[in-house]
Amino acid sequence: MSAHSTAVGTAKRRTFAIISHPDAGKTTITEKLLLFGNAIQVGGSVKGKKGPHAKSDWMSMEQERGISVTSSVMQFPYKERTVNLLDTPGHEDFSEDTYRTLTAVDSVLMVIDGAKGVEDRTIKLMEVCRLRDTPILSFINKMDRDIRDPIDVMDEIETVLNIEAAPINWPIGMGKEFKGVYNLYTDIIHVFHHGQGSRIPDDTQIKGLNSPEADALLGAYAADIRDEIELVKGATHKFDLDAYLAGKLTPVFFGTALGNFGVREMLDGFVEWAPPPLDREANTRVVSAVEDKFSGFVFKIQANMDPKHRDRIAFMRVCSGTYTRGMKMRHVRLGKDVKISDAVTFLAGDRSQVEEAISGDIIGLHNHGTIQIGDTFTEGEDLKFTGIPHFAPELFRRIRLKDPLKVKQLQKGLQQLSEEGSTQVFFPLRNNDIIVGAVGVLQFEVVAYRLKDEYKVEAIYEPVSVATARWVDCEDDKKMAEFKRKCEDNLAIDGGGHLTYLAPTRVNLSLSQERYPDVLFRSTREH
């Protein structure tokens, strides 16, 4: 691919992830987006449930439970753009993978349940988006159900998530009375039709809120709806592209993913406004997305995507240049040149060989244990991309073996699972315990399942009095030595060899931070 055509292709890429609370409709909206992109023919192919079309559940545990534990990648064309959608676990439980996936995208679609408003999972994910000022576009879902007053939901987005919200369209009615949406910028009503959820729906438009056709649709409510829309125009933020791109304002669309309504308008806005692949910070310089030379970083490793092959796949975000099949690239951390001839791309589980990938694309590399999260690959330059963090776990368990003779297998399994990012493992300085940390409860189940399935180790969990963890660091060696001596009971080494403070309570953490002001307590750590 010539440098010019790479630059043109890069400008047309849109790489994003969807964030939402469980049950807000993320799986449904993913399915509708793929329908518009002609990536799947039948509405219903991405179900996170045990439907016959299930496309995005790989691990056998996922298939048993009917949830998507791991994030997959889907690419589809839309309006002369190439859209890369990174799916993130939407189950009641999620993991660090969800957080890290957000470091590999250029923008985010936030799906909010119109009946429930902003929920705690969304708040956590927004905090991660804040680390990089990621642009956020919002879709308020389930307008065909009885929902809260849209003004209240908008207000909640602004106050709870601390971001300005600019409605692009406004719902006309809700629940059984839902008639459609009115675009505040084009003066067009898009009319809602029932029963078109599993295909690309008809787009019936009425031009002009004050037209006779609008009167016929709105009936007795016409005057009230016009008043409400006037009020909304006066009381809400106007859409500002620069503020959106800076992560300070979110354009808001209303619709129903299940009814496949409002999704098209949102997707139109998304491909128009969302940024193409952005430049990325590395340790020595900023890498431009349109540079000729290839570079990329690994943000996620997934095991056993194919039970027949017991392999692990490293997901890599291409940051510059072009990957071509059979090319040589430098694995910077190991200082080794490797030939990559079998990278894969996915439509959730359907693997296909990649001939070529450019900035913004996600490719999968076969990994036999040498690739770790955060690894950078280049065409020879020694640089390392930054901003791919470990997040401090929020839940902890002590892990114990049923068969004490299998300590070696347990340590090997935990080491590999922690390199992969499935869990974090801590070895306290004062005893021989092994403590496992996670962001969500399901991660513990996944670890126990995989230890048994892949390493033939049966392990059980016990409660442990750890409330949170912080990576610790101090420039003054003397003060660090004193801290280590006095706090040894609470110190551990993590899977990467880093000193970690395991706080029994939040209060204990605050007191320790006050007592040792020269020691840095970090809640994230670079890979």
From Swiss-Prot:
The keyword Cytoplasm applies. GO terms for molecular function: GTP binding; GTPase activity; guanosine tetraphosphate binding; translation release factor activity, codon nonspecific; translation release factor activity, codon specific. GO terms for biological process: regulation of translational termination. GTP binds at residues 20-27, 87-91, 141-144. Keywords: Cytoplasm, GTP-binding, Nucleotide-binding, Protein biosynthesis. Signal peptide: none annotated. Increases the formation of ribosomal termination complexes and stimulates activities of RF-1 and RF-2. It binds guanine nucleotides and has strong preference for UGA stop codons. It may interact directly with the ribosome. The stimulation of RF-1 and RF-2 is significantly reduced by GTP and GDP, but not by GMP. This is Peptide chain release factor 3. It comes from Saccharophagus degradans (strain 2-40 / ATCC 43961 / DSM 17024).
